[in-house]
Structure formats: structure tokens, C-alpha cells
UniProtKB/Swiss-Prot annotation:
Species lineage: Bacteria, Pseudomonadati, Pseudomonadota, Gammaproteobacteria, Enterobacterales
EC number: 4.1.2.52
Reactions listed under catalytic activity: 4-hydroxy-2-oxoheptanedioate = succinate semialdehyde + pyruvate
InterPro entries found in the cross-reference section: Aldolase/citrate-lyase_domain (IPR005000), HKHD_aldolase_ent (IPR023701), HpaI (IPR012689), HpcH-HpaI_aldolase (IPR050251), Pyrv/PenolPyrv_kinase-like_dom (IPR015813), Pyrv_kinase-like_dom_sf (IPR040442)
The name this protein goes by in its record: 4-hydroxy-2-oxo-heptane-1,7-dioate aldolase
Residues annotated as catalytic: 45 (proton acceptor)
Residue sites binding substrate per the record: 147, 174-175
Pathway(s) this gene product operates in, as recorded in its UniProt entry: Aromatic compound metabolism; 4-hydroxyphenylacetate degradation; pyruvate and succinate semialdehyde from 4-hydroxyphenylacetate: step 7/7
Positions of the record's site feature: Transition state stabilizer: 70
Keywords of this entry: Aromatic hydrocarbons catabolism, Lyase, Metal-binding
Amino acid sequence: MKNAFKDALKAGRPQIGLWLGLANSYSAELLAGAGFDWLLIDGEHAPNNVQTVLTQLQAIASYPSQPVVRPSWNDPVQIKQLLDVGAQTLLIPMVQNADEARNAVAATRYPPAGIRGVGSALARASRWNRIPDYLHQANDAMCVLVQIETREAMSNLASILDVDGIDGVFIGPADLSADMGFAGNPQHPEVQAAIENAIVQIRAAGKAPGILMANEALAKRYLELGALFVAVGVDTTLLARGAEALAARFGAEKNLSGASGVY
């Protein structure tokens, strides 16, 4: 078993991604052919569940783009279900400290290394037990990315980075800026300083730093600092702004309500 995304991070190869929020396998397959290294299937803020994640994993499977799945919470039951339908790389939201990071890792590992329940006969991940020795290979194929999104998490970053099994740390600019008192303004100098310092610290610890940033100049800046997995856009935003721009070119009045945002 292999995890191409995990291997790329370990090799230090920057991976450029796109956020998927449409919760639809048809659009996921369309975007899987666009040339991004990875696609984030969002179960935290998009209307996804295990079934919709499954259909998107199936739609993406034949393309080079690697799927990353974000559950709605650091919940071992939800994590178990996502792994069973075939997710190998998870982005765990709102991890505040080392204990929560350890819990995330444990949820992705079969015993004795962790607490993942064994149900491989029912699981797409094992191809219904057609993958030889799946139970003994699966742990090494898991890629765990944790999100730090608050001042508390930032203050605990060093101990989070010490947790075995953490492959990368993702900085959440939207929640971080809100927690720092600058909601809706992740480009505030204080927020940017915190983000840049974290990227350098994460990379120095031998882990992969990641972030979502649709501002092209900032995304490139983060890559220069050492970020290794950077999402540079969101499907819903691309569709909404692209449709508005097309309509505007033919005389439609643009509805500006909500047109600007963090991403």
C-alpha cells in the first residue's frame, strides 16, 4: 500500500491543492482532471457525510490528484468511517494541544498502535479484504494532518510537533484571524506574522506545513517560507465569482453581498 501524498510531503515536494465544498462527485471528478496535486473534501463546513465523501473518493480515484478528507471534528468514530470508505489522508480540524493530536493519530491506527476498529471485510479501503495483509500495512499508509486555528494551539505548537504520527500541521487562517481579534482579515500584519512564524517552526521540526490561501502572492510567499501543502482556491468561490464576472460582462448588476470573504 502506498500514499502518494504522504510520500510527496516526506520528500519535501510542494503540493498545490484545491478545496472542494460542492459536495458532489460530478464536480469532484471534473476538478480532479484540472491538474492539482491534491483535493480537499471538506466535511467540516461543506454539506458532506460519509456517503458523499465516498462518491467523491470514487470519482477522484482514477486521476493523479490525491484526496484529502476533513472530518467535521476530531472524532474517532467519524475517522474510522472515513478510513473504511478509502480515505488515507485526513485533515483534523481544531486541534488545540498534544493530547488531541495524539488522539487523532490513535484513531487512524489499528491496535496495538491505536484504536481504529477492525471491519475490513466491509471496507472499501481494504477492497473488501482483497488487499493482501491490509491490516498490517494500513497504519503506515495513513497521513495525519492537524489544524492549528487558535492562539491556544499556536502556543502549544512545539508539543504538537513532538507527537509521533503527525505528518503535517495546517494553519487555519480564517479561524486564527478571528481568534486573534481580526475576524475576516487574515492578512492583518499580526496574523501574517503568526502564520509565517508557524510555517518556519513546523518545517524546522521536520513536519509539513500547510495552509489555504487564495491570495496568489501570499500563497507563493508561504511556499517560499517552506509550506509543503498549499490550497490555492475553493471550488464554490471559483464558481460564484466566475459566474458573477460573466454575468457582469453582459450587463448584469453584480450582487456584492458576501462577495468578499476570507478565501
